[in-house]
């Protein structure tokens, strides 16, 4: 069985996709995003899945997407912000090189505007984001082998910090 070089976790808008693509380039490997896997397989946006089928149905799809990607992908893998909510998914991450990209709420506002395209943040986005982070922070920390703060850093700086944190050398 193969395993990803690095798995990225963290809240929505933290930069997992951007940093993941930069990491893949610097390591000379592929990049994969489980949210994109779900969108491709379902033929619709994640927000539509939430509206049409509910969060529980989405989390089931997400769990399977993560399981498949962990088994198939050998490069850099980015997980959706809520993937770590599932205990089985957290168990699958044991033994993986997992980097938790963190940010505070002010950084989240700057990066995402905490906009309505985020289905879990549709009402009072700042309050919702804080509550999500209070519920998830310890789960991100539990699965992480390294934590990289992204606040005030460029994607390139975060990428270098992630490489340094997991002691990987560029290709």
Swiss-Prot record:
Binds 1 Mg(2+) ion per subunit. Mg(2+) binds at residue 17. CDD domains: SK. The keyword Transcription regulation does not apply. ATP binds at residues 13-18, 118, 153. Monomer. It catalyses: shikimate + ATP = 3-phosphoshikimate + ADP + H(+). This is Shikimate kinase. Belongs to the shikimate kinase family. One of its GO terms (cellular component) is cytosol. Its cofactor is Mg(2+). The gene is aroK. It is an enzyme of class 2 (transferase). Catalyzes the specific phosphorylation of the 3-hydroxyl group of shikimic acid using ATP as a cosubstrate. Its main location: cytoplasm. Substrate binds at residues 35, 59, 81, 136. It comes from Streptomyces coelicolor (strain ATCC BAA-471 / A3(2) / M145). InterPro entries: P-loop_NTPase, Shikimate/glucono_kinase, Shikimate_kinase/TSH1, Shikimate_kinase_CS. One of its GO terms (molecular function) is magnesium ion binding. PANTHER family: SHIKIMATE KINASE, SHIKIMATE KINASE 1, CHLOROPLASTIC. Pathway: Metabolic intermediate biosynthesis; chorismate biosynthesis; chorismate from D-erythrose 4-phosphate and phosphoenolpyruvate: step 5/7. GO terms for biological process: amino acid biosynthetic process; aromatic amino acid family biosynthetic process; chorismate biosynthetic process. Keywords: Amino-acid biosynthesis, Aromatic amino acid biosynthesis, ATP-binding, Cytoplasm, Kinase, Magnesium, Metal-binding, Nucleotide-binding, Transferase.
């Amino acid at each position: 069985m193969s395993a990803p070089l690095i798995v990225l976790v963290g809240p929505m808008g933290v930069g997992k996709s951007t940093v993941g693509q930069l990491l893949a380039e610097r390591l000379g490997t592929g990049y994969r995003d489980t949210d994109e896997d779900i969108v491709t397989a379902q033929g619709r946006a994640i927000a539509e899945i939430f509206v049409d089928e509910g969060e529980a149905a989405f989390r089931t799809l997400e769990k399977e997407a993560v399981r498949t990607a962990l088994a198939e992908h050998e490069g850099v893998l980015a997980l959706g912000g809520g993937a770590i909510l599932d205990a089985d998914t957290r168990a699958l991450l044991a033994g993986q090189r997992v980097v938790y990209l963190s940010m505070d709420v002010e950084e989240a506002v700057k990066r995402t505007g905490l906009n309505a395209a985020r289905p879990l943040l549709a009402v009072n986005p700042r309050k919702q984001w804080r509550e999500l982070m209070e519920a998830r922070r310890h789960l991100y920390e539990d699965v992480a082998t390294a934590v990289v703060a992204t606040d005030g850093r460029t994607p390139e700086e975060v990428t270098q910090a992630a490489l340094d944190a997991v002691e990987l050398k560029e290709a």
